[in-house]
């Protein structure tokens, strides 16, 4: 099925391009999300008329995504899962679980924008998850899968202390550069 993209989609193409996709993908995802329309002469002329508006809208979404990316920078999520003695969890970690935790922390993120990079999380440990906020903005966040609440609390305390010390070092470096600049 030929469609016209109404926004940049990393895997398909740029705004306004005519691309061929499977009918189910278009019907079930692209059309309902208003990311594309069917490629007809009517829609092509409409799109040309609306191109500037769509580009402005895309720039606004990009700016919102960049702001959200700043709030997710250095973000980590701790998941508590039941596991066997050798560290295998019962079941696996899903994108919905991560999206739910992020929502509880005030970040509204669709679970479909989360990607494990083709890896299935079935063991305790540390994992990298990519959050695609926009076709041009992908933010990595760290997922820690632990066995108990005490492990989770210890990990959170250690991570928060590390972030505070890094922040203090950055402030000291900035102050040092400011005072060095004043001496010249």
From Swiss-Prot:
<feature type="region of interest" description="Disordered">
    <location>
        <begin position="160"/>
        <end position="184"/>
    </location>
</feature>
<dbReference type="InterPro" id="IPR000244">
    <property type="entry name" value="Ribosomal_bL9"/>
</dbReference>
<dbReference type="InterPro" id="IPR036935">
    <property type="entry name" value="Ribosomal_bL9_N_sf"/>
</dbReference>
<dbReference type="GO" id="GO:0006412">
    <property type="term" value="P:translation"/>
</dbReference>
<keyword id="KW-0699">rRNA-binding</keyword>
<dbReference type="Pfam" id="PF03948">
    <property type="entry name" value="Ribosomal_L9_C"/>
</dbReference>
<dbReference type="InterPro" id="IPR036791">
    <property type="entry name" value="Ribosomal_bL9_C_sf"/>
</dbReference>
<dbReference type="InterPro" id="IPR020070">
    <property type="entry name" value="Ribosomal_bL9_N"/>
</dbReference>
<comment type="similarity">
    <text>Belongs to the bacterial ribosomal protein bL9 family.</text>
</comment>
<dbReference type="GO" id="GO:0019843">
    <property type="term" value="F:rRNA binding"/>
</dbReference>
<keyword id="KW-0694">RNA-binding</keyword>
<dbReference type="GO" id="GO:0003735">
    <property type="term" value="F:structural constituent of ribosome"/>
</dbReference>
<dbReference type="GO" id="GO:0005840">
    <property type="term" value="C:ribosome"/>
</dbReference>
<dbReference type="GO" id="GO:1990904">
    <property type="term" value="C:ribonucleoprotein complex"/>
</dbReference>
<dbReference type="InterPro" id="IPR009027">
    <property type="entry name" value="Ribosomal_bL9/RNase_H1_N"/>
</dbReference>
<comment type="function">
    <text>Binds to the 23S rRNA.</text>
</comment>
<dbReference type="Pfam" id="PF01281">
    <property type="entry name" value="Ribosomal_L9_N"/>
</dbReference>
<dbReference type="InterPro" id="IPR020594">
    <property type="entry name" value="Ribosomal_bL9_bac/chp"/>
</dbReference>
<keyword id="KW-0689">Ribosomal protein</keyword>
<protein>
    <recommendedName>
        <fullName>Large ribosomal subunit protein bL9</fullName>
    </recommendedName>
</protein>
<feature type="compositionally biased region" description="Basic and acidic residues">
    <location>
        <begin position="173"/>
        <end position="184"/>
    </location>
</feature>
<keyword id="KW-0687">Ribonucleoprotein</keyword>
<dbReference type="InterPro" id="IPR020069">
    <property type="entry name" value="Ribosomal_bL9_C"/>
</dbReference>
């Amino acid at each position: 099925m030929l469609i016209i993209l109404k926004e940049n989609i990393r895997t398909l193409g740029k705004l306004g391009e005519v691309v061929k996709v499977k009918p189910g993908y278009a019907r079930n995802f692209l059309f309902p999300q208003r990311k594309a329309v069917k490629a007809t002469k009517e829609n092509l002329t409409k799109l040309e008329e609306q191109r500037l508006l769509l580009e402005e809208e895309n720039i606004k979404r990009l700016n919102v995504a960049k702001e959200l990316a700043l709030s997710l920078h250095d973000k980590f999520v701790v998941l508590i899962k039941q596991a066997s003695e050798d560290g295998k969890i019962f079941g696996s970690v899903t994108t919905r679980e991560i999206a739910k935790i992020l929502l509880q922390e005030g970040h509204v993120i669709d679970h479909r924008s989360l990607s494990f990079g083709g890896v299935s999380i079935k063991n305790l440990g540390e994992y990298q998850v990519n959050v695609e906020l926009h076709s041009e903005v992908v933010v990595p966040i760290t997922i820690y899968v632990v066995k108990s609440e005490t492990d989770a609390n210890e990990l959170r305390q250690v991570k928060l202390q590390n972030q505070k010390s890094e922040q203090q070092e950055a402030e000291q470096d900035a102050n040092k550069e400011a005072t060095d600049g004043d001496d010249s």
